[in-house]
């Protein structure tokens, strides 16, 4: 089974969301659950899926600190819907740690995930946070 990067991001979101709810879950079993409906079939884990999941988990504290910088006054990480937080972590990870993904692509993919797994209000919130990130990056490069 060959997955597009978009499909891999969807699977990564599903895995990270599940791990957020149950950090002790068996990673290998979760990989198989998001990759196939057949419990008897063992599917190889795409490299980019493992990169996203392991990268977000390894850098979670750093990613949360970065996200926290871009929240409006009065907002805290614990107030963010779990779906939105997972999407933001993935986007920040791709922006900061994945060189072959342009930042605008990471933002667009995050918005697509929000469209599929969250609601319109959350999509606008995610867009606002990520827009500030790109604005700051543009200011730094200028």
UniProtKB/Swiss-Prot annotation:
One Pfam family per UniProt: NusB
Domain of life assignment: Bacteria
MF-aspect GO terms: RNA binding
Keyword Transcription regulation: yes
Keywords attached to this entry: RNA-binding, Transcription, Transcription antitermination, Transcription regulation
Xref: SUPFAM superfamilies: NusB-like (SSF48013)
The family this protein is said to belong to: Belongs to the NusB family.
Protein name, UniProt field: Transcription antitermination protein NusB
Lineage, top ranks: Bacteria, Bacillati, Bacillota, Bacilli, Lactobacillales
């Amino acid at each position: 089974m060959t997955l597009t990067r978009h499909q891999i991001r969807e699977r990564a979101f599903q895995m990270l969301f599940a791990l957020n709810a149950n950090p002790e879950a068996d990673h290998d079993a979760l990989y198989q659950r998001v990759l196939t409906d057949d419990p008897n079939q063992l599917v190889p884990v795409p490299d980019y899926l493992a990169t996203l999941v392991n990268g977000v988990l390894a850098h979670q504290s750093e990613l949360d600190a970065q996200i926290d910088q871009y929240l409006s006054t009065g907002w805290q990480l614990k107030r963010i819907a779990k779906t939105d937080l997972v999407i933001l972590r993935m986007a920040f990870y791709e922006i900061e740690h994945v060189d072959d993904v342009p930042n605008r692509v990471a933002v667009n993919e995050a918005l697509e995930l929000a469209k599929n797994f969250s609601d319109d209000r959350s999509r606008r919130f995610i867009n606002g946070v990520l827009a500030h990130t790109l604005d700051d990056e543009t200011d730094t490069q200028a």
